[in-house]
Protein backbone atom coordinates (compact mmCIF):
# COMPACT_ATOMS: atom_id res chain seq x y z
CA UNK A 1 0.00 0.00 0.00
CA UNK A 2 1.30 3.42 -0.88
CA UNK A 3 0.56 6.13 1.65
CA UNK A 4 -0.81 9.21 -0.02
CA UNK A 5 0.27 12.65 1.20
CA UNK A 6 -2.68 14.33 2.82
CA UNK A 7 -2.31 15.55 6.37
CA UNK A 8 0.19 15.85 9.12
CA UNK A 9 -0.84 15.89 12.73
CA UNK A 10 1.44 18.75 13.53
CA UNK A 11 -0.94 21.64 13.94
CA UNK A 12 0.33 23.56 16.96
CA UNK A 13 -2.09 24.29 19.72
CA UNK A 14 -3.07 27.90 20.11
CA UNK A 15 -2.96 28.78 23.75
CA UNK A 16 -4.78 32.00 22.90
CA UNK A 17 -7.84 29.82 22.36
CA UNK A 18 -8.22 28.80 25.95
CA UNK A 19 -11.55 30.58 26.17
CA UNK A 20 -13.69 29.27 23.36
CA UNK A 21 -17.15 29.95 24.68
CA UNK A 22 -18.10 32.79 22.43
CA UNK A 23 -21.35 33.49 20.69
CA UNK A 24 -21.70 32.14 17.17
CA UNK A 25 -20.83 34.69 14.52
CA UNK A 26 -23.56 34.71 11.94
CA UNK A 27 -21.57 34.61 8.77
CA UNK A 28 -18.22 35.39 10.21
CA UNK A 29 -15.05 34.79 8.43
CA UNK A 30 -15.70 31.13 8.01
CA UNK A 31 -18.02 32.15 5.29
CA UNK A 32 -15.22 30.90 3.12
CA UNK A 33 -16.61 29.39 0.02
CA UNK A 34 -14.32 26.51 -0.70
CA UNK A 35 -14.43 27.01 -4.44
CA UNK A 36 -12.26 24.12 -5.54
CA UNK A 37 -9.51 24.67 -7.94
CA UNK A 38 -10.39 28.30 -7.81
CA UNK A 39 -9.21 30.98 -5.54
CA UNK A 40 -8.97 30.70 -1.83
CA UNK A 41 -6.23 29.65 0.38
CA UNK A 42 -5.36 28.99 3.93
CA UNK A 43 -3.07 27.67 6.56
CA UNK A 44 0.63 27.34 6.60
CA UNK A 45 2.25 24.34 4.97
CA UNK A 46 2.41 21.14 6.86
CA UNK A 47 5.81 20.03 7.91
CA UNK A 48 5.49 16.72 6.14
CA UNK A 49 3.22 14.33 4.34
CA UNK A 50 -0.15 13.39 5.70
CA UNK A 51 -2.26 10.33 5.45
CA UNK A 52 -5.70 9.15 6.52
CA UNK A 53 -7.37 5.72 6.54
CA UNK A 54 -9.67 6.18 3.60
CA UNK A 55 -8.94 3.27 1.30
CA UNK A 56 -11.39 0.53 2.13
CA UNK A 57 -12.67 -0.22 -1.33
CA UNK A 58 -10.38 1.90 -3.43
CA UNK A 59 -6.76 1.77 -4.37
CA UNK A 60 -4.21 3.68 -2.36
CA UNK A 61 -4.08 6.16 -5.17
CA UNK A 62 -7.65 7.23 -4.52
CA UNK A 63 -6.75 8.98 -1.30
CA UNK A 64 -6.73 7.46 2.15
CA UNK A 65 -7.22 8.25 5.80
CA UNK A 66 -3.56 8.45 6.61
CA UNK A 67 -2.40 11.90 7.53
CA UNK A 68 0.35 13.78 9.25
CA UNK A 69 -0.39 16.16 12.07
CA UNK A 70 1.42 19.43 12.53
CA UNK A 71 -1.17 22.05 13.39
CA UNK A 72 -0.19 24.06 16.43
CA UNK A 73 -2.75 24.22 19.19
CA UNK A 74 -2.27 27.97 18.97
CA UNK A 75 -3.84 27.79 15.53
CA UNK A 76 -7.08 26.19 16.63
CA UNK A 77 -9.06 29.39 17.02
CA UNK A 78 -11.85 29.91 14.52
CA UNK A 79 -13.03 33.15 16.10
CA UNK A 80 -14.21 35.49 13.38
CA UNK A 81 -14.29 32.82 10.70
CA UNK A 82 -17.78 32.20 9.39
CA UNK A 83 -19.10 28.91 8.06
CA UNK A 84 -21.01 30.29 5.09
CA UNK A 85 -19.11 28.37 2.47
CA UNK A 86 -15.60 27.50 1.44
CA UNK A 87 -15.95 28.66 -2.15
CA UNK A 88 -14.02 31.19 -4.17
CA UNK A 89 -16.71 33.76 -3.53
CA UNK A 90 -16.52 33.22 0.20
CA UNK A 91 -12.79 33.77 0.22
CA UNK A 92 -13.06 37.01 -1.71
CA UNK A 93 -15.17 38.83 0.87
CA UNK A 94 -14.03 41.83 2.88
CA UNK A 95 -14.86 39.91 6.05
CA UNK A 96 -12.52 37.06 5.15
CA UNK A 97 -9.72 39.47 4.27
CA UNK A 98 -10.14 41.25 7.60
CA UNK A 99 -10.01 37.97 9.51
CA UNK A 100 -7.07 36.64 7.52
CA UNK A 101 -4.94 39.76 7.91
CA UNK A 102 -5.25 39.88 11.68
CA UNK A 103 -2.58 37.16 11.69
CA UNK A 104 -1.77 35.92 8.15
CA UNK A 105 0.67 33.19 9.20
CA UNK A 106 -1.72 31.62 11.67
CA UNK A 107 -4.72 32.06 9.36
CA UNK A 108 -2.78 30.39 6.55
CA UNK A 109 -1.99 27.42 8.78
CA UNK A 110 -5.59 27.07 9.89
CA UNK A 111 -6.98 27.39 6.37
CA UNK A 112 -4.56 24.76 5.12
CA UNK A 113 -5.98 22.28 7.60
CA UNK A 114 -9.60 23.35 7.14
CA UNK A 115 -9.40 22.76 3.40
CA UNK A 116 -7.58 19.48 3.85
CA UNK A 117 -10.23 18.30 6.26
CA UNK A 118 -13.28 19.61 4.39
CA UNK A 119 -12.39 19.18 0.71
CA UNK A 120 -11.51 16.13 -1.35
CA UNK A 121 -7.99 15.31 -2.45
CA UNK A 122 -8.62 16.47 -6.03
CA UNK A 123 -9.85 19.90 -4.92
CA UNK A 124 -8.00 23.04 -3.90
CA UNK A 125 -8.61 26.64 -2.97
CA UNK A 126 -6.49 29.58 -4.08
CA UNK A 127 -6.41 32.94 -2.42
CA UNK A 128 -4.59 36.19 -3.15
CA UNK A 129 -4.32 38.45 -0.13
CA UNK A 130 -5.67 41.83 -1.31
CA UNK A 131 -3.57 43.62 1.30
CA UNK A 132 -0.17 42.05 0.67
CA UNK A 133 -0.55 40.46 -2.76
CA UNK A 134 0.74 37.14 -1.40
CA UNK A 135 -0.84 34.11 -3.08
CA UNK A 136 -1.86 30.94 -1.24
CA UNK A 137 -2.98 27.51 -2.42
CA UNK A 138 -4.67 25.06 -0.09
CA UNK A 139 -5.08 21.43 -1.10
CA UNK A 140 -8.04 19.23 -0.22
CA UNK A 141 -7.59 15.86 1.42
CA UNK A 142 -10.19 14.00 3.46
CA UNK A 143 -13.39 15.42 1.98
CA UNK A 144 -15.25 15.37 5.30
CA UNK A 145 -17.55 18.34 4.56
CA UNK A 146 -18.63 18.05 0.90
CA UNK A 147 -21.44 20.62 1.07
CA UNK A 148 -19.41 23.27 2.84
CA UNK A 149 -16.46 22.61 0.55
CA UNK A 150 -18.55 23.36 -2.53
CA UNK A 151 -19.82 26.69 -1.26
CA UNK A 152 -22.91 25.86 0.81
CA UNK A 153 -23.20 26.97 4.44
CA UNK A 154 -21.70 24.40 6.79
CA UNK A 155 -24.20 22.13 8.49
CA UNK A 156 -23.89 21.42 12.22
CA UNK A 157 -22.59 17.96 11.34
CA UNK A 158 -19.94 19.45 9.06
CA UNK A 159 -18.87 21.88 11.76
CA UNK A 160 -18.46 18.96 14.16
CA UNK A 161 -16.52 16.68 11.84
CA UNK A 162 -14.17 19.45 10.67
CA UNK A 163 -13.63 20.48 14.30
CA UNK A 164 -12.77 16.88 15.17
CA UNK A 165 -10.40 16.76 12.21
CA UNK A 166 -8.61 19.95 13.24
CA UNK A 167 -8.21 18.69 16.79
CA UNK A 168 -6.92 15.33 15.55
CA UNK A 169 -4.21 17.12 13.56
CA UNK A 170 -3.06 19.34 16.39
CA UNK A 171 -0.22 18.85 18.80
CA UNK A 172 1.38 21.27 21.19
CA UNK A 173 4.87 20.59 19.80
CA UNK A 174 3.95 21.36 16.20
CA UNK A 175 5.77 18.18 15.13
CA UNK A 176 4.61 16.24 12.08
CA UNK A 177 3.60 12.68 12.88
CA UNK A 178 1.84 10.22 10.59
CA UNK A 179 -1.58 9.27 11.94
CA UNK A 180 -4.45 7.07 10.84
CA UNK A 181 -7.82 8.84 10.83
CA UNK A 182 -10.99 6.75 11.01
CA UNK A 183 -14.64 7.68 11.05
CA UNK A 184 -17.38 9.02 8.79
CA UNK A 185 -17.81 12.16 6.75
CA UNK A 186 -20.74 14.55 7.12
CA UNK A 187 -22.78 12.46 4.67
CA UNK A 188 -22.26 9.39 6.86
CA UNK A 189 -19.87 7.66 4.46
CA UNK A 190 -17.02 5.81 6.14
CA UNK A 191 -13.45 6.90 5.45
CA UNK A 192 -11.94 3.91 3.61
CA UNK A 193 -9.14 1.96 5.22
CA UNK A 194 -7.27 -1.30 4.68
CA UNK A 195 -6.18 -4.11 6.94
CA UNK A 196 -2.58 -3.18 6.17
CA UNK A 197 -3.16 0.33 7.48
CA UNK A 198 -4.69 -0.95 10.68
CA UNK A 199 -1.73 -3.28 11.07
CA UNK A 200 0.85 -0.56 10.39
CA UNK A 201 -0.92 1.95 12.63
CA UNK A 202 -1.49 -0.63 15.31
CA UNK A 203 -1.45 1.67 18.34
CA UNK A 204 -4.83 3.05 19.27
CA UNK A 205 -4.59 6.69 20.17
CA UNK A 206 -7.69 8.80 20.77
CA UNK A 207 -11.08 10.04 19.70
CA UNK A 208 -11.68 13.74 18.99
CA UNK A 209 -15.01 15.57 18.95
CA UNK A 210 -16.70 18.91 19.58
CA UNK A 211 -17.51 22.10 17.68
CA UNK A 212 -15.05 24.97 17.33
CA UNK A 213 -17.50 27.11 15.40
CA UNK A 214 -20.37 27.46 17.87
CA UNK A 215 -18.32 28.08 21.01
CA UNK A 216 -18.63 24.55 22.37
CA UNK A 217 -14.93 23.77 22.06
CA UNK A 218 -13.14 20.53 21.18
CA UNK A 219 -12.41 17.45 23.26
CA UNK A 220 -10.08 14.45 23.20
CA UNK A 221 -10.32 11.11 24.96
CA UNK A 222 -7.74 8.33 25.06
CA UNK A 223 -8.42 5.05 23.25
CA UNK A 224 -5.58 2.95 24.74
CA UNK A 225 -5.18 3.97 28.33
CA UNK A 226 -2.71 6.52 29.62
CA UNK A 227 1.00 6.40 28.88
CA UNK A 228 3.27 4.63 31.34
CA UNK A 229 5.85 6.71 33.19
CA UNK A 230 8.60 5.56 30.83
CA UNK A 231 6.54 6.36 27.71
CA UNK A 232 6.07 9.67 25.90
CA UNK A 233 4.85 11.03 22.57
CA UNK A 234 4.48 14.36 20.83
CA UNK A 235 0.84 13.34 20.38
CA UNK A 236 0.23 14.27 24.00
CA UNK A 237 -3.15 15.90 23.32
CA UNK A 238 -4.72 12.55 22.48
CA UNK A 239 -2.42 10.33 24.50
CA UNK A 240 -1.36 11.97 27.80
CA UNK A 241 0.35 10.27 30.70
CA UNK A 242 -2.56 11.19 32.97
CA UNK A 243 -5.62 13.45 32.96
CA UNK A 244 -3.61 16.03 34.91
CA UNK A 245 -0.91 16.13 32.22
CA UNK A 246 -3.23 16.69 29.26
CA UNK A 247 -2.26 20.34 28.82
CA UNK A 248 -3.35 20.99 25.24
CA UNK A 249 -5.75 23.90 25.45
CA UNK A 250 -8.02 24.64 23.73
CA UNK A 251 -8.40 20.85 23.41
CA UNK A 252 -10.02 19.60 26.61
CA UNK A 253 -9.21 16.10 27.87
CA UNK A 254 -12.51 14.31 28.50
CA UNK A 255 -11.52 10.83 29.72
CA UNK A 256 -11.66 7.61 27.72
CA UNK A 257 -13.33 6.85 24.41
CA UNK A 258 -14.72 3.63 25.84
CA UNK A 259 -16.68 5.49 28.51
CA UNK A 260 -17.92 8.31 26.26
CA UNK A 261 -18.37 6.85 22.80
CA UNK A 262 -20.30 4.25 20.83
CA UNK A 263 -18.37 2.09 18.37
CA UNK A 264 -19.49 1.75 14.77
CA UNK A 265 -21.76 -1.16 13.98
CA UNK A 266 -19.81 -4.17 12.69
CA UNK A 267 -22.14 -4.41 9.71
CA UNK A 268 -20.97 -0.99 8.55
CA UNK A 269 -17.34 -2.05 8.20
CA UNK A 270 -15.78 -2.78 4.80
CA UNK A 271 -14.23 -6.05 6.01
CA UNK A 272 -14.15 -8.20 9.11
CA UNK A 273 -11.90 -6.88 11.87
CA UNK A 274 -9.92 -9.65 13.54
CA UNK A 275 -10.82 -8.74 17.08
CA UNK A 276 -14.47 -8.42 16.15
CA UNK A 277 -14.34 -4.83 17.33
CA UNK A 278 -14.87 -1.95 14.88
CA UNK A 279 -11.79 0.33 14.75
CA UNK A 280 -13.63 3.63 15.13
CA UNK A 281 -16.42 5.34 17.04
CA UNK A 282 -19.62 6.72 15.52
CA UNK A 283 -20.76 9.01 18.34
CA UNK A 284 -19.35 10.47 21.55
CA UNK A 285 -21.47 12.06 24.27
CA UNK A 286 -20.05 14.65 26.64
CA UNK A 287 -21.83 17.04 29.00
CA UNK A 288 -25.16 15.79 27.69
CA UNK A 289 -24.41 16.50 24.03
CA UNK A 290 -23.70 13.91 21.35
CA UNK A 291 -21.04 14.59 18.70
CA UNK A 292 -19.71 12.89 15.59
CA UNK A 293 -16.07 12.01 16.34
CA UNK A 294 -12.95 10.94 14.49
CA UNK A 295 -10.76 8.14 15.82
CA UNK A 296 -6.98 8.09 15.43
CA UNK A 297 -4.23 5.47 15.49
CA UNK A 298 -0.42 5.71 15.59
CA UNK A 299 2.56 3.68 14.52
CA UNK A 300 4.33 2.02 17.47
CA UNK A 301 7.52 3.98 16.72
CA UNK A 302 5.77 7.23 17.64
CA UNK A 303 5.32 6.17 21.25
CA UNK A 304 8.79 6.59 22.74
CA UNK A 305 10.18 4.66 25.68
CA UNK A 306 12.94 5.65 28.07
CA UNK A 307 15.76 3.21 27.45
CA UNK A 308 15.34 2.86 23.68
CA UNK A 309 18.67 4.64 23.11
CA UNK A 310 17.35 7.91 21.68
CA UNK A 311 16.83 11.11 23.67
CA UNK A 312 13.49 12.27 22.33
CA UNK A 313 12.01 15.76 22.34
CA UNK A 314 9.57 14.48 24.94
CA UNK A 315 12.30 13.14 27.26
CA UNK A 316 14.59 14.90 29.72
CA UNK A 317 17.98 14.32 31.29
CA UNK A 318 18.20 13.01 34.83
CA UNK A 319 19.06 9.96 36.88
CA UNK A 320 15.76 8.12 36.52
CA UNK A 321 14.02 5.70 34.17
CA UNK A 322 10.95 7.78 33.33
CA UNK A 323 10.38 10.14 30.41
CA UNK A 324 10.88 13.24 32.54
CA UNK A 325 14.18 11.92 33.92
CA UNK A 326 15.68 9.43 31.49
CA UNK A 327 19.35 8.77 32.20
CA UNK A 328 19.64 5.90 29.70
CA UNK A 329 18.69 8.07 26.72
CA UNK A 330 19.48 11.66 27.73
CA UNK A 331 22.21 11.22 30.34
CA UNK A 332 22.46 12.98 33.66
CA UNK A 333 21.80 16.69 33.79
CA UNK A 334 24.95 18.90 33.71
CA UNK A 335 23.94 20.91 36.74
Predicted regions and their residues:
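Post-signal peptide N-terminal segment of mature Sec-exported envelope proteins
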Residues: 49-70
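Cysteine-rich modules of extracellular adhesion/ECM and protease-associated proteins
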Residues: 303-335
Amino acid sequence: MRLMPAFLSGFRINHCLKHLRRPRIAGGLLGLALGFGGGACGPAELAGDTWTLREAHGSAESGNGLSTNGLSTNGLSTNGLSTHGLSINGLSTIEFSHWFNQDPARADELMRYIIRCAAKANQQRKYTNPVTGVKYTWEGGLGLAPNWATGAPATAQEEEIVSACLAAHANKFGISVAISVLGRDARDSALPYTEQELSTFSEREACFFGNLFDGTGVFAATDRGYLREDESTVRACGLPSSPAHADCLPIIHAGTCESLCQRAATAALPFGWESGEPPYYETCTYNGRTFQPLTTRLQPRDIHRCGDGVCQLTERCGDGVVAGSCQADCGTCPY
